[in-house]
Amino acid sequence: MNGAECEPLLQTDRYLMRNCARKLIRTADRIKEETGAKEFIIALKAAYTREIESLERAIEELGSSVKLHKLQSFFPAGDEQTIVYEVTGRVVPPAAIPLSVGCVVSNVATIYGIGDAFEGEPFTRKFLTVTGEVAHPTILRVPVGTPVSECIALAGGTHLSRYIVVNGGPMMGKMIPMEEVPNSYVTKTMSGLIVLPEDSAIARRNQVTVKHMINQAKSACIQCSFCSQMCPRALLGHPIRPNKIMRKLSSGTPIGEMLNDPDVRNAALCCECGICEIYACPMGLKPRTVNSMLKKELAKAGIRYQRPEGVEYTARPERGMRKAPTERVASRAGVGAYENLKIDDFFSVNPEEAGCVRLSLRQGIGAPSVPTVKDGDPVKAGERIAACPEKSLGSELHASVSGTVSIDPDGAYIEIRTGKSWSYEKQEP
C-alpha cells in the first residue's frame, strides 16, 4: 500500500491512516488472503509519526501480519516504480508495470474503497484535500460529481478575488482557471484541490504555450543535463534522457520528423513527475511538458515503446544522493507557505442532503462508460448508472446520490438532480 503521499500539500491518505487504521489493516489482511500474496507492506514516510503509531496499534490489536516500510521524505517517493524499488529492490522495466516484478501497488484511499466493496458498498464518494488559500484547509468526503465550487465552500471559501484551482498536487496536478471552476466536478481520480492566487508560480508555468516552450529550448537550454541527472526513472536505470530530448527539440526539426529518433521515443518513459522542470532545470525550461506533448504525438502516430529483449535494468549508484527533499520541492513549486499546514479537520457530505451532481462518463484512462439508464429515470444512491464498454478496459459508474437522471446530449456526463440545494451535515468517516 502506497502511503507515501509524496505530492506536497496533499494529506488525504495521512488522514485515513491516522483515523481509519483498523479498517485499512482489516482490508489489507483480507486482500492478502484473497490474492494469496506472500506479503502486504505499507510504505510510508518515516516522518509520518502519528500515522505510524495508528497503524502499528491497529496491527497489534488485530494480530495482523501487515508490515510497515519507512521511507525517506523525498519526491516522488509515491511513484509506483520508485516505491517498488524502495521496498523490494526490484527495478520495474521501462514501459512495464509493477506486476512484471511480482508487485501490486495501491494507494490508501483505494484500499479504503476496497474495504467498502468487501462490505457491498460501491465507490460513490471521494476523499479530498482542500487547501491553499482557503479559510479552513480540510479533508472532505463528498459524492462523486460534487461541484468543485461546493468543495471550496466547504473549506470556508477563499478571500481571493482572482484565483486558480489545482486539481491534484502542485507537481503533477492540472490547473483549473477560475472561469472553469463552476463547470468542474469531483471525479473518482481527483485527489485534492489547491486554491492559489491567479499570479502564482504554478499559474504562470501553465500559461506557457508549446511554441514558447520550443523557442525557450532553442535559446536557453545550456545542456547541463541536470534534468537527466535528477530524473527518477533515469535513476532507476531507464534509458530516458530529457536533456537529449531538449537538444533535439532545439535543433528546429519539425516534431513529426523527430518521432523516429530513439531519444525522442524514450519520452514515452516519462512519468511526468515534474522534477526536471520544477526542481532540476536552472533555466526554468519545461522538459516534462515537452515529454508530455511528445507522448501524445507518438500515440497519434501509433508508435509504442519497444523494450529491447535480454536487457537487465539496475538502479544507478548515485540514486541515493539525488533524491529531492519534499520541502525543497514544495518551495521550488511555489507552495512552500502551505507545506507545513496540519490538516485534521474533516467534513463528510451526507449524500441524502446533497444537491445536483454531475458524473463524467470518462473517470480514468480507460474507455468512457456507457449509460445503463435513460433521461428521466429515478435512481438511488449506489445504483449502477453506467457500465464498462464490452471488450474494453474501463469502469462501472454508480449513482452517488438519489435523484432523477439527465444525460448530456453529447454523451460526456450523467447529471443526477436531487431537487435540493447543497446542505452540509457533518459525519464521521
What label would you give each PLM region?
Residues 18-35:
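Histidine-anchored nucleotide/phosphate-binding helix
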Residues 380-394, 412-415:
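Short hydrophobic beta/alpha edge segments that flank linear recognition/processing sites
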Residues 369-378, 382:
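Short histidine-centered loop motifs in beta-beta connectors
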Residues 344-367, 388, 396-399:
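Short beta-strand-turn/beta-hairpin segments enriched in glycine/proline and small hydrophobics
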Residues 1-13, 134:
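Gly-rich Lys/Arg/Thr-decorated short loops/hinges at beta-loop-alpha junctions or inter-strand turns
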Residues 38-150, 154-161, 167-169, 175-179:
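Hydrophobic alpha-helical positions that pack around
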Residues 196-218, 228, 233-315, 375:
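Ferredoxin-type iron-sulfur electron-transfer modules in oxidoreductases and energy-metabolism complexes
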Residues 90-94, 98-99, 107, 308-350, ...:
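Extended boundary segments
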